[in-house]
Amino acid sequence: MFQKKFRYMAAVLAALMITQGSFTAFADEIGPGYDEQNKASTDTSVTDPANAWKKVNGVYVDNNGKTIEGALLRGISVAKWQGDIDWAKVAADDISFAFIKMMSYGYEGGYTMDPNYEKNMKGAMDNGVQAAPYVYLQTKTVEEAKAAAKYAVEKVSGYNVKYPIAVDVESKYILELSVQELTDVVNAFCDTIVAAGYTPIVYSDYSKFTTEMDTKQIHYDIWLARYGADGTYEGRTIWQCTDKGHVNGINGNVCLEFAYKDYAPVTKGTAVDTGEWKNESGKWYFYRDGGRMSLHI
């Protein structure tokens, strides 16, 4: 009898461990470039019209053929789900910028780098596509958000990043916070990015921007995910219009973006070979090329 009970308990424990492991992995996969319902955004059974989200007669048009007022540049967002990307073909298909997944950063300092991050950063930049890293944030405290941002700054060292470093706010874990708590976490991440001399941007969908955080307290640019023909939102400088786009050089569907602001001429981020954070008398400073750059807020 004891042996039977032991075997039963062991089987239950093993099942729980497998379930927990699968759940953790799934939580790490969501983000731009990932279709939660269809897993990776590679299902080509549903696509937009052939001329949707492209430049027609000198202007960008939506999936109904209407002009996208104010759209300056077309871009994409990618992660490991897009596999090997031919960046030369991407660049030739009127793609000016790309949000590239850097990592998922969780609570208690845990993080997972996207395996294609460095390859995609180099591929984009080598072909004239502005690369913009994004971090899928799962932190629950201000201090953890600051740590995530500092690590992100270290991981862009060596790249000539001119577009924003994005914080992806959609994890179910981070959404357990109150509106004020989540707003504070987002601001902490962005403040730290600014302190290092880079430009931050906040990614989420319309529902979360309007119900989960107080955007009136977030004085940073908005990267809005709202699929269809309405990308208007206060503070929105980049609009993710669809996850069913198609771009040469990428197998399957990909998220398409439109920029209403060209960051390249104004962003302060530059290639950094020796950038690092140092704690001096309880305060954090970022050093570039041997000199102190700015105070960590």
Q: What is the predicted function of each stretch?
A:
Residues 58-190, 194-196:
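Substrate-binding cleft of extracellular glycoside hydrolase catalytic domains
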Residues 131, 199-201, 222:
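Hydrophobic anchor at the start of a short beta-strand
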